[in-house]
From Swiss-Prot:
Keywords: Chloroplast, Membrane, Photosynthesis, Plastid, Thylakoid, Transmembrane, Transmembrane helix. This is Photosystem I assembly protein Ycf4. Seems to be required for the assembly of the photosystem I complex. GO terms for biological process: photosynthesis. Belongs to the Ycf4 family.
């Protein structure tokens, strides 16, 4: 859902609030609770949940390990749920020809640097660079090549674009900014 006019282009960026992250967070927390309950059940010597039998698990060392993994999983699940709640990584890329400025805005973790905003001049953009790595885990990323600076990624590293979609996106942006496209 991009917005584009003659002078302005805005590309929204999805953050961590995705269906796959929701599924992983839910599975992680359920598994961690299960591990914790089995570990505590082995300590108490009776089953806290009838479905999860702990009769054959000795508290030392298996029960302690189960508790440790359960607690670690709960902390990881809490972290994942927080990133989903805060939608870390979401934002937008704004290209404003009238002002001659590019704004890259992203939401970060709460605190002093929650809002991440990078600005630079359109005249400093040399090209749009496409990085394509095929194989077991393909990687397709668009970058802005800027004079005297490091390349700035425009898409998420794990964004699942087909080669055609990526080429179209790069061509539209290069046409809008009137710069060339470089492949890698």
């Amino acid at each position: 859902m991009n917005y584009q006019s003659e002078w302005l282009r805005i590309d929204p960026i999805k953050g961590s609030r995705r269906f796959s992250n929701l599924c992983w967070a839910f599975i992680l927390v359920l598994g961690a609770i299960g591990f914790s309950l089995v570990g505590f059940s082995s300590y108490l010597g009776r089953d806290l949940i009838p479905i999860l039998s702990s009769q054959q698990i000795i508290f030392l060392p298996q029960g302690i390990v189960m508790c440790f993994y359960g607690i670690a999983g709960i902390f990881l699940g809490f972290y994942l749920w927080c990133t989903i709640l805060w939608n870390v990584g979401s934002g937008y890329n704004q290209f404003n020809k009238r002002e001659g400025i590019v704004y890259l805005f992203r939401w970060g973790f709460p605190g002093e640097n929650r809002r991440i905003c990078i600005r630079f001049m359109i005249k400093d953009i040399q090209a749009i660079r496409m990085e394509i790595q095929e194989g077991f885990s393909p990687r397709r990323v668009l970058y802005l090549r800027i004079k005297g600076q490091q390349d700035v990624p425009l898409t998420r590293l794990d964004e699942e674009l087909t080669l055609r979609e990526m080429e179209e996106k790069a061509a539209e942006l290069a046409r809008f900014l009137r710069v060339s496209i470089e492949g890698f």
